[in-house]
């Protein structure tokens, strides 16, 4: 099962500051668009990655997630922005209403909060997620909004295509938010050992190149 989107947030204050996007998640690494999947009850994962995100910000992130009961996944993420020398903490819950299958789309809702120091910036977001199987791959759709303190909410929308490439799983995605240039992103992920995933992505926003590389361990 893919990792939860606090990369998402586009789970991340790193992303929020540039486009008010979620990645919060963490989406299923290395995607920024979230998927409707969650970990099985009693299972979890730890995702870690380095990225150059919107605005040229560079950051390290560690993001654990766990499903205490069927259909509910809770997660946290700590990001250190080495460009701004700031630290962001994010917490989110993801409730799956229907599980994705080959015959039916899956749906989930995500609620999250974030705090950045030393700027003392607070943010919150909401994301509706749908995943549908469309042979030979999967389509993921996101629609939500994010808000920082004393500012109006900003809507965002995202779409991603994910497909098995044989040697790895690959994706291409598009994310847009109010008052920000859209992001186009693509990348692979591959299991290099039992329960251990290596992943990466490269993308563009407003003429800038974005990239990330990370690992995800299931437990």
Protein language model features and the residues they cover:
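Cleavable N-terminal export/targeting peptides
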Residues: 1-32
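Transmembrane beta-barrel domains of Gram-negative outer membranes and organellar outer membranes
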Residues: 26-219
